[in-house]
Swiss-Prot record:
The keyword tRNA processing does not apply. Residues 168-171 are annotated as: G4. This is Sulfate adenylyltransferase subunit 1. Residues 34-41 are annotated as: G1. Keywords: ATP-binding, GTP-binding, Nucleotide-binding, Nucleotidyltransferase, Transferase. Belongs to the TRAFAC class translation factor GTPase superfamily. Classic translation factor GTPase family. CysN/NodQ subfamily. It catalyses: sulfate + ATP + H(+) = adenosine 5'-phosphosulfate + diphosphate. Pfam families: GTP-eEF1A_C (PF22594), GTP_EFTU (PF00009). Pathway: Sulfur metabolism; hydrogen sulfide biosynthesis; sulfite from sulfate: step 1/3. One of its GO terms (molecular function) is GTPase activity. Heterodimer composed of CysD, the smaller subunit, and CysN. With CysD forms the ATP sulfurylase (ATPS) that catalyzes the adenylation of sulfate producing adenosine 5'-phosphosulfate (APS) and diphosphate, the first enzymatic step in sulfur assimilation pathway. APS synthesis involves the formation of a high-energy phosphoric-sulfuric acid anhydride bond driven by GTP hydrolysis by CysN coupled to ATP hydrolysis by CysD.
């Protein structure tokens, strides 16, 4: 057993008391991102090592692996703690998203180590989708690169409010304050173009040597800020979903016998209470919450993030993908939306193509009506394009086969985030973030929609023998 963990359990008075203490710690989900070979995996290995989260047998195995696959000469290659795939170890790079867990006395952490190569940008977007904070690594020798900008923009797009810019490998530039200041200024110039307000912090460090990771560096007396670990332990995270209205996407209908019908899922935002009047969309039918059932027993109130089963007072028709919300809220269904898309397939995305869409447990189809623009990652400018290439990011108009109830992604990542699936191969080819639901075209003053008027004009022009009258009252 890890000696530090054993000591913590002993101090808490046993395993059960230690587990209770762990449950009451706050949880921070963060990812490491940046360009290839910036030291992301090494940084995570250093965090695990310096917080004493490595078991003795893991440390022994790491020594042996460092001799066979290591890239640091005689030194311990901490990146091997995270790079688990054989291909990753052979190439000395990260390919898949690797998740690691560790804790300190102040907080629990889940880390997503994401790949830096451009062809694995889709993996990075996957890792970032559930995180509250992003550590953006920059090699002190190279400065701000294209992937630095790309990952910054994707993190911002996915609603991550906290960015920690870790300027790594300071030992290779002589721990130069001038180098740190120059990179900091370059990044702030770029970050000024990112949408929204961001909490951006800068930490100069050496993941290989441990400077300013968990302990203050003696080699950089000019830096008097917190270490990286101190930033992670103290940053205040405010979850948007806690302050948003109730959203409960139905994941499945739970009907174990004739006496019970419940609607299971995870509460995406807000809270729900027993007795609360709720509305089912898209049908609009209303009812009251009779019970809130969980594995550990019934609740009187549930909050965002909890997996629950709702039992309603009335027997009404509810299916997987329906959305439950407070009865007093009016959320119209829409059939089109402007969606920010991160494209993940070799075949480009073009207007006119159709795909399967999954959003909040519901599966439907959508057609690409138009690509409004693609974002140039280097300067965040928008340019008109005919198609969106692999790893391209752009704003796309989608029309769905049926009306959907949507929030914007910034309001609610669950009801505003979708995945795009190829209908033939069933492969996920894109990630979408709803920027703006587009409401149906309003009826004209005549009472007819634009579509009906256009169809009427077409029939009268090409089929006059049908004798169709002009809906606007003309001849």
């Amino acid at each position: 057993m890890n000696t530090t963990l054993a000591q913590q359990i002993a101090n808490e008075g046993g395993v059960e008391a230690w587990m209770v203490a762990q449950q009451h710690k706050s949880l921070l989900r963060f990812l490491t991102c940046g360009s290839v070979d910036d030291g992301k995996s090494t940084l995570i290995g250093r965090l695990l090592h310096d917080t004493r989260q490595i078991y003795e047998d893991q440390l022994s195995s790491l020594h042996n692996d460092s001799k066979r696959h290591g890239t640091q000469g005689e030194k311990l290659d901490l990146a091997l703690l995270v790079d688990g795939l054989q291909a990753e170890r052979e190439q000395g790079i990260t390919i898949d998203v690797a998740y690691r867990y560790f804790s300190t006395e102040k907080r629990k952490f889940i880390i997503a180590d994401t790949p830096g190569h451009e062809q694995y940008t889709r993996n990075m977007a996957t890792g970032a989708s559930t995180c509250d904070l992003a550590i953006l690594l920059i090699d002190a020798r190279k400065g701000v690169l294209d992937q630095t900008r790309r990952h910054s923009f994707i993190s911002t797009l996915l609603g991550i409010k906290h960015l920690v810019v870790a300027i790594n490998k300071m030992d290779l530039v002589g721990f130069s304050e001038e180098t740190f200041a120059r990179i900091r200024e370059d990044y702030l110039t770029f970050a000024g173009q990112l949408p929204g307000n961001r909490d951006i912090r800068f930490v100069p460090l050496s993941a290989l040597e441990g400077d300013n990771v968990a302990t203050q560096s003696a080699s950089m007396p000019w830096y008097n800020g917190p270490t990286l670990l101190e930033v992670l332990e103290t940053v205040e995270i405010q979850r948007v979903v806690d302050t948003q209205p109730m959203r409960f996407p139905v994941q499945y209908v739970n009907r174990p016998n004739l006496d019970f019908r419940g609607y299971a899922g995870t509460l995406a935002s807000g809270s729900v209470k027993v007795g609360q009047r709720i509305k089912v969309l898209p049908s609009g039918v209303e009812s009251n919450v009779a019970r809130i059932v969980t594995f550990d027993g019934d609740l009187q109130e549930a909050h965002a993030g909890e997996a629950i089963t709702l039992v309603l007072k009335d027997e009404i028709d509810i299916s997987r993908g329906d959305l439950l919300l407070d009865a007093g809220e009016n959320l119209p269904a829409v059939q089109s939306a402007a969606v920010d898309v991160v494209w993940m397939a070799e075949q480009p995305l073009s207007a006119g193509q159709s795909y399967d869409i999954k959003i909040a447990g519901k599966k439907t189809r959508a057609r690409v009506d138009a690509i409004r623009h693609q974002v140039d990652i280097n300067n965040l400018t928008q340019r008109e394009v005919e198609s969106l290439p692999l790893n391209g990011i752009g704003l796309v108009e989608l029309t769905f086969d049926e009306p959907l109830v949507l929030d914007t992604y910034q309001q609610n990542p669950v009801t505003g985030g979708l995945i795009i699936i190829d209908r033939l191969s069933n492969v996920t080819v894109g990630a979408g973030l709803v920027r703006e639901p587009i409401e149906h075209t309003a009826a004209t003053p005549s009472g007819f929609s634009d579509f009906e008027l256009e169809l009427n004009a077409l029939i009268r022009r090409h089929f006059p023998h049908w004798g169709a009258r002009d809906l606007l009252g003309g001849k």
